[in-house]
């Protein structure tokens, strides 16, 4: 099994998979009579059907034991999905490029600094939310509508990966 190298999350490195939601280096302008800085259009919500709705939820995720064996990835073919950390804690992101199935050799891992969120583009393969050391809350923006919006792929045993953030 290959151990994933965990990369710092950056807009450039994550671009094939989606958007990094952060204020650093982002376009902004003043609003509210100069009392508020608006960081504009940090990500775009994607939905497949005109009747779909963009929705906002909170996910409360428990930390998983590390090192973690990556046995599966999922994707949302009908809409994007954004995770914005609410408690300021770093979290892990595991992704693979678009395709009919994820390719184990192309899987990448990133770590958010806790002030960065991410928006997976529609159809991007990813692991479910991964907190590092404790329960964490995330603001989630995704779509609600008809149709199956979650495909799962389970890797064969020899394709599985190891995620070890403390090594």
From Swiss-Prot:
Its EC number is 4.3.2.3. Its cofactor is Ni(2+). Gene3D superfamilies: Ureidoglycolate hydrolase (2.60.120.480). Keywords: Lyase, Purine metabolism. It holds the Pfam family Ureidogly_lyase. It catalyses: (S)-ureidoglycolate = urea + glyoxylate. InterPro entries: RmlC_Cupin_sf, UAH_cupin, Ureidogly_lyase, Ureidogly_lyase_bac, Ureidoglycolate_lyase_dom_sf. Pathway: Nitrogen metabolism; (S)-allantoin degradation. PANTHER family: UREIDOGLYCOLATE HYDROLASE, UREIDOGLYCOLATE LYASE. GO terms for biological process: allantoin catabolic process; purine nucleobase catabolic process. This is Ureidoglycolate lyase. Belongs to the ureidoglycolate lyase family. Homodimer. HAMAP family: Ureidogly_lyase (MF_00616). GO terms for molecular function: ureidoglycolate hydrolase activity; ureidoglycolate lyase activity. Catalyzes the catabolism of the allantoin degradation intermediate (S)-ureidoglycolate, generating urea and glyoxylate. Involved in the utilization of allantoin as nitrogen source.
